[in-house]
Swiss-Prot record:
Source organism per UniProt: Staphylococcus epidermidis (strain ATCC 35984 / DSM 28319 / BCRC 17069 / CCUG 31568 / BM 3577 / RP62A)
Phylogenetic lineage: Bacteria, Bacillati, Bacillota, Bacilli, Bacillales
Annotated GO biological process: cell wall organization; peptidoglycan biosynthetic process; regulation of cell shape; response to antibiotic
Protein location: Cell membrane
The UniProt record lists the keyword Cell membrane: yes
Cellular component, GO, one term: plasma membrane
Catalytic reaction annotation: di-trans,octa-cis-undecaprenyl diphosphate + H2O = di-trans,octa-cis-undecaprenyl phosphate + phosphate + H(+)
GO MF, one annotated term: undecaprenyl-diphosphatase activity
Further information: Bacitracin is thought to be involved in the inhibition of peptidoglycan synthesis by sequestering undecaprenyl diphosphate, thereby reducing the pool of lipid carrier available.
Protein name: Undecaprenyl-diphosphatase
Transmembrane segments: 1-21, 48-68, 101-121, 125-145, 161-181, 202-222, 231-251, 266-286
Length: 290
């Protein structure tokens, strides 16, 4: 039984690492896994399972922090980083550089919304039906953004983002607190609609997400610290490591491919997932009444 629980923990860490920064909604996937699998197997008990999911999310966050470590050091004026060259062809303009203010401006909307409504969001939106709605609406938004990207040029790199763009992208991050909508799907789509290329929008999304996710995860652990048990430490360690290692691979692969594959393939996956889960949930009652 102990070995089986460890395997479940590793699987959850892999799912978290694969989905946290892909535009498919890791929270949505974890809720689906929770409602349609974990609750039926009573993995660690409901409250301890929640803290486990927070811990493995930290694994993915630390993976993103590692991938962008040079950027964070430069933003904090600890390291040196040359801004990406402009592709606009204007050599007279002095290149901008992404700085701490951009990150803070992008964090403000989600920070305020999370502080005010975190408990309500967790109470009313963390269910299979609401996740399916978020997955579907988010997929449509991503398709619209990709269609728009084919009709305009996207010359801006991440170092050319201005404060207004950072704030608007931050608003879309706040909207993505609806489980299933997807933080990266929402913010990358908004960045593309604001004339960033897909890679630049992805870079800013990941950089902006790390501090706010660290804060949110830390707050969740403080609120539920009584459910952290020494007996569960092996699960936390293995789940964290699985999420961290898989997250590193997933993030690097995603950033390498995003300008080529765009967002539509992820949107199609989301729509197919919605149909599949809806059939299981509404047609066969799997995940209901657990």
């Amino acid at each position: 039984m102990f070995l089986l629980e460890l395997i479940k923990g590793i699987i959850l860490g892999i799912v978290e690492g694969l989905t946290e920064f892909a535009p498919v909604s890791s929270t949505g996937h974890m809720i689906l896994v929770d409602d349609m699998w974990l609750k039926s197997t009573n993995f660690l008990g409901s409250q301890s399972a929640f803290t486990f999911k927070v811990v493995i999310q930290l694994g993915s966050v630390f993976a993103a922090a590692w991938v962008f470590r040079e950027r964070f050091l430069e933003i904090l004026h600890i390291g040196q980083h040359k801004p990406e060259p402009s592709t606009s062809g204007d050599r007279r303009s002095k290149p901008r550089r992404l700085n701490l203010i951009h990150v803070l401006v992008g964090m403000v909307p989600a920070g305020i919304l999370g502080f005010l409504f975190d408990d309500l969001i967790e109470k009313y939106l963390f269910s299979v039906p609401t996740v399916l709605i978020g997955l579907f609406i988010g997929a449509i938004y991503m398709i619209i953004a990709d269609k728009y990207s084919k009709t305009v040029q996207h010359p801006q790199t991440v170092d050319q983002i201005n404060y207004f763009q950072a704030f608007v992208i931050g608003i879309s991050q706040a909207i993505a607190m609806w489980p299933g909508f997807s933080r990266s799907g929402s913010t990358i789509s908004t960045g593309v609609l604001m004339k960033l290329n897909h890679k630049a929008a992805s870079d800013f999304t990941f950089i902006m997400s790390v501090p706010i996710m660290l804060a949110a995860s830390g707050l969740s652990l403080l609120k539920h610290y009584e459910y952290i048990h020494l007996a569960h430490i092996p699960f936390y360690i293995l789940g964290f490591l699985a999420a961290f290692i898989v997250g590193l691979i997933a993030i690097k692969t995603f950033l390498h491919l995003i300008n080529k594959v765009k967002l539509v393939p992820f949107a199609i996956y989301r729509i197919v997932l919605v149909i599949f889960i809806a059939i299981l949930y509404f047609g066969f009652g799997i995940g209901k009444g657990i």
